[in-house]
Amino acid sequence: PLIHNTAYGVLGLDWSYEKIEVPRAGLRKFISELDADWAGFSVTMPLKEEAFRFVDSKNEAAELTGAVNTLARTETGWAGYNTDVFGIVQAVRTAAIGSLDTVLIVGSGATATSAVVAVRELSPDAKVLVFARNAQARAALVNFACSIGLQARSVYSLKSPAQRADLVISTLPGGALDEISAKLNRWFGFKPQGAVLDVAYSPWPSAFATHWSDAGKPTISGLDMLMWQAIAQLRIFTHGDAETPLPNEVAVVEAVRHALDN
C-alpha cells in the first residue's frame, strides 16, 4: 500500500489502496460482488493464475507468462496485466549496466518466467542460462525461453556462470539463497564480472547480492522491481495504459523512493 498511496498523494488523487485477503480459488467470487467504486487490484500468488483464467482481456506479458498480477476495470469487463516484466525491465534499465550478452536466471517459478520475457525486451540476442533445482521446471523454462526466440540452456553449477554473466537475476524468495551464498563464500576467488538483480529485498543487501557489491559491481534491489511494477499498475489505473507515463512521473518516482528508503 505504501507505494500506491504515496503516488496518489503526489498525483492529487482521492483514492485509497489497501490489502485484502482473498482465499485461494475465491478471486472470481470476490470480484463479482464488487460495486463500481473499485477500479483495479494488484494480485499476488497464489491468485495470479486464477486471475489469468477469468479476465476478459490480457496484455502481451500476461499472455506470454500465463499470469496476471494486475486487474483493471474497463467498459467491457476486467483487463489483466503482468507488470512484473515491466518492473524487471525498468529496474535493469535505470541501473544502466551496459550490454547484456549473457543473463543467468536463478529459479524457475512465475517470477523467473517474467524475467525471461524481460530479457527478451532488454536484449533479444542475449544468451539465457537457467539455474534451478527442479529439473522439470528448469527444462520448461529453458523451452519457454527458446519458444520466444531466445538462446537458452540449463546450467548445473553457479560458480562459473554467476561470475561470467553480464546480469544475474535471482527470482528466489528471501533466505532461499542463503545456502548458495555460503558456498560462494567458500569459493576462493569468486569475482563476479557483471551485475545482479535480487528480487528479495529484506534484508538488503541480501547475502547473495553482497558478493557483487563487495566486488564493486552493480546491485539492483528487488525494491526497484517492486516500485516499477507498481508504477506500471498506477499508469493502468489512471489511464488504462501501462506504456504512457504518469503526469509528473519523475516526482512520483522520487516520492516513492523516499518513502521506501524511510
Task: Annotate the PLM regions.
Residues 199-262:
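Adenosine-phosphate binding glycine-rich loop
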Residues 97-99, 120-124, 183-193:
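Short, conserved loop/helix-junction motifs that constitute active-site signature segments
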Residues 121-127, 215-218:
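Conserved S-adenosyl-L-methionine
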Residues 124-148:
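NAD(P)-binding Rossmann-fold cofactor-contacting core
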Residues 82-85, 92-96, 100-120, 132-133:
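Glycine-rich adenosine-cofactor-binding loop
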Residues 146-220:
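Rossmann-like adenosine-cofactor binding region
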Residues 1-96, 203, 211:
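Phosphate/diphosphate ligand-binding glycine-rich loop within oxidoreductases
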